[in-house]
UniProtKB/Swiss-Prot annotation:
Family: Belongs to the bacterial ribosomal protein bL36 family.
InterPro entries: Ribosomal_bL36, Ribosomal_bL36_sp, Ribosomal_L36_bact
Name of the gene: rpmJ1
Gene Ontology molecular function: any one: structural constituent of ribosome
GO biological process: translation
Keywords: Ribonucleoprotein, Ribosomal protein
Highest taxon listed in the record's lineage: Bacteria
Organism: Kineococcus radiotolerans (strain ATCC BAA-149 / DSM 14245 / SRS30216)
One cellular component term from this protein's GO annotations in UniProt: ribonucleoprotein complex
Chain segments annotated as transmembrane: none
Name assigned to this protein: Large ribosomal subunit protein bL36A
Length: 40
């Protein structure tokens, strides 16, 4: 999982889901797990 300042480009990938957990924003992608990221 990468830590990114901005998740804007990752949100647009096919199969992406934006999830908020414990105050952090995550992008999860089951189709293509290399796009997994956390903001901050």
């Amino acid at each position: 999982m990468k830590v990114r300042a901005s998740l804007k480009s990752l949100k647009q990938k096919e199969g992406s889901i934006v999830v908020r957990r414990r105050g952090k924003t995550y992008v999860l992608n089951k189709r293509n797990p290399r796009w997994k990221a956390r903001q901050g």
